């Protein structure tokens, strides 16, 4: 970093760009002589959520900058990433709008670390209380017009035409477009697949004060993104709950979604047959594992946003939507103590139900994501 500081700004930009291109080549396993164009999208180069984090970790190790796990989505090509890297390493002397997705290199997140430590020690209730108290102190918005920036919609699929499939990211601390990258990769044609990221999870973003504020902010972004084009909504876990409520809001605006797909979504009121604390511990264990690997990602902001958002979704029931709905149910329980009927109150309100191999997480990962995507694709095509 000191060596970079001694360079003139123009030369520094070139060095950072070369560093990004070289690091991308290394992560992809290409020969050192391989040339990557500065404006070539990372998606076209073959980056996914895992290789994106590898690139992020490599750049952090080389520069000391703290970058988000979703870096290849926030900064879609080497030149854009190099510019963002320069902005955080050498910020302007005058105050300016923060660089989206980047945080201070000197910040130590004690609050977030306390939460992770409590979760690792099995102190779920204490961890939740701690972060809910923090969430209550964060800035809130009641009207989407109060936001500095609208929730982002990020193209994650390779197809450039076809009806829109908007995947609503879950309201959890690991949220981001990377949740759906493997799912989106399965749709090589026929659908324009994008991810919609909820507000409040990035540094400095306000939290929605109410469920209505959350849904309206997302609806504004979707309306701007798709116009009057055909669209379907997909959501995994809490993302499915938000997708359902978002569809109702769009329906009220005269922008009727073709369909809504809920991938193992559920209400948050301790449904009968689900061992609530064990289930939540299993969910959090997986997310903590990810955050430990992708450390430095604004833990306090992300965790308080998760706790607050899930509070907003309490009491949810799938009612008031005219669009057809599909519930995708994993056949493998997340914890052995689950009873198969605990999803009943949600499933009973769905148009269709499809069982797929895997558990709550693996239905969107590895060998099982293909089965999930095929079920969704087949069901949506039959509606057309």
Report the location of each language-model feature:
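Short acidic (Asp/Glu) and glycine-rich catalytic loops that position anionic groups and cofactors
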Residues: 1, 60-65, 352-353
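A short alpha-helix capping/helix-coil boundary motif
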Residues: 1, 33-36, 224-226
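Glycine-rich phosphate/pyrophosphate-binding loop
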Residues: 1-12
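Generic, ordered loop/turn and secondary-structure boundary motif
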Residues: 5, 37, 43, 51, ...
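Short, contiguous strand/loop micro-motifs
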Residues: 7-8, 42-43, 234, 303
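Phosphopantetheine-dependent thiolation modules in NRPS/PKS and related acyl-activating systems
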Residues: 10, 14-141, 265-270, 370-373
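A hydrolase-biased, glycine/serine/histidine/acidic-enriched motif that marks catalytic-domain neighborhoods
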Residues: 18, 99-384
